[in-house]
């Protein structure tokens, strides 16, 4: 929806990431250890699944919380809305800070395998701070909660969990995730001032209203 110069500059918006030895980094390390403990649990399985943003990964992640399957076939307008937001949230809202700090990811710093080893080669070339996955998940949750207000609690909780999954996977620090939510919130505010986004959002709301009236929403 947006061009790079239309999005809040994450480098100006965010503080620098915590440095090793600081109290903030000690919390990052504690959360990393917490995340490792979750990997052998059902929550760890969810975290690994949340790492997949390709194809229908994002829409599938939010379908249960949203109350109806989000897909090209069943909810084309809603699907288009959240799909078009992905680059805005995951790239544009995080790019400046990511490129400037190029923060080393947890699995690299601690010399341990992440929960998604197949993605490590690419992740190693991409800065850890802030988290793009988190930004996508939180921005998506904010917009879906606006469409289906009756399930805002479930949707926002799922969006929060989506970010925590990155800590569990060992590919982001907690501070990366927290920062991802900040830039995502700023992005959604800016999207609401964009005519193209507002037009698509209106289509998505109209589509949802019809589905709800037809009794197809939980």
For the regions a language model picked out, list residue spans one by one.
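Primarily interfacial, aromatic-capped hydrophobic alpha-helices that serve as membrane anchors
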Residues: 203-218
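Catalytic phosphate/nucleotide-handling subdomain of diverse soluble enzymes
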Residues: 185-187
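Hydrophobic alpha-helical bundle signature of multipass membrane enzymes
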Residues: 1-169, 190-193, 200, 211
């Amino acid at each position: 929806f947006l061009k790079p110069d239309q999005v809040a500059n994450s480098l100006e918006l965010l503080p620098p990431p915590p440095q090793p030895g600081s109290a903030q980094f000690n919390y990052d390390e504690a959360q990393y250890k917490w995340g490792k403990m979750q990997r052998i649990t059902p929550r760890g399985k969810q975290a690994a699944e949340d790492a997949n943003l390709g194809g229908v990964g994002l829409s599938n992640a939010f379908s249960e919380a949203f109350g109806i399957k989000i897909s090209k076939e069943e909810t084309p307008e809603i699907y288009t809305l959240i799909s078009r937001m992905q680059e805005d949230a995951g790239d544009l809202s995080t790019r400046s800070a990511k490129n400037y700090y190029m923060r080393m990811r947890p699995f690299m710093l601690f010399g341990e395998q992440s929960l998604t080893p197949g993605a490590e080669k690419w992740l190693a070339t991409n800065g850890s701070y802030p988290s793009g996955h988190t930004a996508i998940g939180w921005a998506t949750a904010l917009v879906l909660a606006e469409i289906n207000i009756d399930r805002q609690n479930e949707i926002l909780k799922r969006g929060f969990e989506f970010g925590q999954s990155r800590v569990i996977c060992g590919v982001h620090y907690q501070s990366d995730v927290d920062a991802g939510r900040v830039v995502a919130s700023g992005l959604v505010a800016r999207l609401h001032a964009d005519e193209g986004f507002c037009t698509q959002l209106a289509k998505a709301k109209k589509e949802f209203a019809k589905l709800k009236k037809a009794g197809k929403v939980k």
